[in-house]
Amino acid sequence: MSQWKNICKIDDILPATGVCALLGNEQVAIFRPYHSDQVFAISNIDPFFESSVLSRGLIAEHQGELWVASPLKKQRFRLSDGLCMEDEQFSVKHYEARVKDLSLIHI
């Protein structure tokens, strides 16, 4: 990515949770699955219901992959690329995310 944007501090996200942030006009769900500085970012919009809810979903691990389950009907989206586990015809946009200088999350 050519232009990284500061989003929030890593400490703004409790481990095993997500938050929603605005990146331009897009809602981005940012997840911190563990106590480490590993973060993932996908669209916050559930494509099945067109609702802004994915940041409030439950994070789970299945067969070595991290997923978030939508709080609505529990469809799971892979955090590494946004693919829907239940129906591969659906996916959400994935964003590159990193932690810079041990504190700031960049997308």
Where are the regions a protein language model picked out?
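A structural signal for short hydrophobic beta-strand segments in well-ordered beta-sheet cores
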Residues: 21, 30, 59-60, 77, ...
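Short cysteine-rich clusters marking metal-coordination/redox-active sites
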Residues: 46, 70
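Immediate flanking context of iron-sulfur cluster ligation sites
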Residues: 32-41, 56-68
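N-terminal first-folded block
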Residues: 8-38
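Conserved small/polar residues in nucleotide/adenosyl-binding loops
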Residues: 105-107
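C-terminal structural segments of small proteins and small subunits
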Residues: 83-90, 94-96
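Short, non-ligating residues that shape and space the ligands of small metal-coordination modules
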Residues: 52-55, 79
